[in-house]
């Protein structure tokens, strides 16, 4: 057998073996993914609906800058693959609105969030991602504080205490790594 035919035969055999192995892995991964997806779906379903509560904001560690009423609603997007959280409140007496689009990446097993907010994000969109927690998830993103300045980090934790109580807490992360509570939303299901 000539060398190029032998090489071609070996390549086909290796490719077929790799494909077969990949199909086995994909079948196994698909089962694991379905379990994670169901868990994700169940979590999203518990969030659906209208919520109300208070939102606290800190601009300096330990120094409360604002405490205002907030209302929010979680709705499913694209048949429940994603969930949208839209909220309205006030910041130091001025109206404030924002939205998050939340998803669970079945490949990376990470929650992913995009966030826009009239006050906190100005005209930017923050992308965050992170791991599930026993009662929700925690994600981390970065945002710009000024031209030619190092980005600051932002960590958000969703904690679904029970079917009627949800706390969303966000922390500023300085470029040096120190963290400080920035925003805390304490929701209860609207009646």
Q: Which role does the model predict for each range below?
A:
Residues 1-5:
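Positively charged n-region of N-terminal signal peptides that target proteins for export
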Residues 22-191:
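Hydrophobic small-molecule pocket/channel-lining residues, especially in calycin-type beta-barrels
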Residues 7-17:
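Bacterial N-terminal signal peptides
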